[in-house]
Structure formats: structure tokens, C-alpha cells
Amino acid sequence: MAPAQVASGRCTPAWPKDALRISFGIIWLIDAVLKWLPGFRSGYMNAIRGEAQGQPGWLKPWFDFWINFQHPRVTLFAYLVAVVETLIALALIAGFARKVTYISAIVFSLLIWGTAEGFGGPYTSGASDIGTAIIYAVVFAALLALSYYAGPSRYSADYYIEKRISWWWKIAETRRPAPAQAPTGAPTLATMSATTATNGTATESRRAT
């Protein structure tokens, strides 16, 4: 794959960001597989209720809303979480609709962090971390930023879809890709035509003389 040009003028390979995306996608796929197990569905609501315990009083309406909203249809929401995580994982690995995938995954991760992980709290004595979903959101934000600076990714489904669907870059890229430029010194169609015409004229002139 062609290296990306950075501000310093040095060329850096573009494959590391693709390796990060695919590796992160594999991690998400493993996590998604676990969401399809019966244990996740059976303990889904208990996990949210457990995180609501000990939270500050001003957060009580937030957790009450999600508990009351999901409780009548717990199985549906448990399956929905499994489906969303699976789709995100597959999109990451394949490099499909990357911009939409990254933004959707950021929103989804923050929602998980604010419900099933209780914002990483309650932050009392003995608390040791702020939750994993917020870290996932940061990684997705980093991937989104990398896609802005590195541009299209050859190791992705988007790269090939963009060749066939002109507007797909709006789904896949954070900015419009620059038009492909011919390498320096490479003959263009116009140059080749002009050269051919010049050679033909020169040949006719020699014949005339």
C-alpha cells in the first residue's frame, strides 16, 4: 500500500492503522460472541440494576428510566446488544462504512458506559477504574481521527466500494478523498495524443521532402 505523507514530509506506511482497526475488530468479535451466550441474557437486567446501586441521587432518574424502559422486554434488548456488537465487529474487520461505524460505535460505547457500567462508578473508596466502554469510545475516536489524516484505506471494503459508488466516501471517509494523480513524469492521455500527432506530422514532413 502506498505510504501516507505526513506534515513533516516523511512518508509513513498506512497499514498500521488498518492493523489497529482489524485487531480491535477481533477483540469486539470475541466480546460479541460472549453476548450471544445464555448467561448474558439471564443476567442482563441484574447487571444494570446492580450498577444503579450506590450511584448519586441526581443520577437516579437516569437509571430508573433505562431499567423501566428495558424491563418489559429484557430479552429483546439483550439480543439487540449482541447484534449491534456483532455488526460493529464485522464492520471493523472488513473496513465497511468506517466513518458511520466509528461514530455509531462511539455512541454505543458511551451508552453502555452510562448504563451497564454505571459511568464506571460509584466512585467510592476502593474504586479502581472508570469502566472499559469509555476506553472503547476513545479508541473509536482515535480511529476516526486516523482516518481523517490517513485517508482511504486499501485494506478495507470501503476502498473497493468507493470505486463503484461515487458517493460512498460520505459513508466511509471523514473528508472527500483527493482525486488520484498520475505519478510525476508519467505520460497522460493528452500528452500521448500530442506526442503521437507530433510524430505523425514529422513523418509526413520527411516523406514530403
Language model regions located:
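Extended, low-polarity transmembrane helix blocks
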Residues: 1-84, 94-209
